[in-house]
């Protein structure tokens, strides 16, 4: 089976020191469910196995046993060239994504050519009860709709989200920090008017101040907008 073949290849690339370092950064992951394969090697394997006629057997074999298998799954999905097929695989995989790393590594190339359909699906993801599905939806709006396809309806939608989940709120902060760098005039009112919860508001400001894309003048102004607890 292709799943066994992929697992054997991953185990052959095991780096125990890297695994032990990595699991400290990813809550919930342990030495028992992580192999320790470095990202460049995972990407190489993903490109290789994505060409296989039987790759669907691996993509259907959910949930996976190892974190590294989730990672290679995300990279394989990112290589799918047909939009409908790719979107179907993303939607099937997202409920099994249980960590920020797998969520953030998944970035299908084909989405760039289908932004209208992507925007509709991203809006649905934001209504999900699953932490990493919401995070992925925000990430897609950040990656694809802050430049030429920007519309204020996107920050408006995201500013209305409320969650007790750290990894949702951190992505909201990341979104607004990136949005301030790319669409300052349209997005700064969300900070001025305190449209986010206090923690996310202050985190968005912090991340903006840390960004080289924000001017010194903008950073100075943002400092005046911090909410003191």
What are the roles of these predicted feature ranges?
Residues 1-229:
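Alpha-helical scaffold domains
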């Amino acid at each position: 089976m292709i799943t066994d073949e992929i697992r054997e290849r991953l185990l052959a690339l095991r780096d125990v020191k890297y695994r032990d370092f990595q699991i400290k950064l990813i809550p919930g992951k342990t030495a028992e469910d992580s192999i320790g394969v470095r990202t460049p090697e995972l990407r190489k394997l993903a490109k290789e196995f994505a060409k296989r006629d039987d790759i669907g057997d691996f993509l259907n074999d959910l949930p996976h046993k190892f974190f590294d298998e989730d990672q290679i799954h995300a990279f394989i999905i990112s290589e799918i060239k047909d939009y409908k097929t790719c979107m179907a695989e993303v939607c099937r995989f997202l409920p099994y994504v249980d960590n920020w790393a797998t969520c953030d590594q998944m970035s299908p190339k084909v989405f760039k050519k289908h932004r209208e359909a992507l925007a509709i699906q991203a809006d649905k993801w934001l209504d999900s009860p699953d932490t990493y599905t919401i995070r992925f939806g925000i990430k897609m709006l950040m990656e694809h709709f802050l430049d030429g396809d920007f519309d204020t309806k996107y920050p408006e939608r995201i500013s209305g989200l409320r969650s007790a989940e750290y990894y949702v709120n951190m992505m909201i902060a990341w979104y607004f920090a990136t949005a301030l760098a790319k669409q300052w005039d349209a997005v700064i009112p969300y900070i001025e008017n305190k449209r986010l919860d206090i923690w996310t508001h202050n985190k968005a400001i912090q991340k903006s101040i840390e960004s080289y894309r924000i001017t010194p003048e903008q950073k100075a102004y943002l400092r005046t907008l911090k909410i003191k607890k």
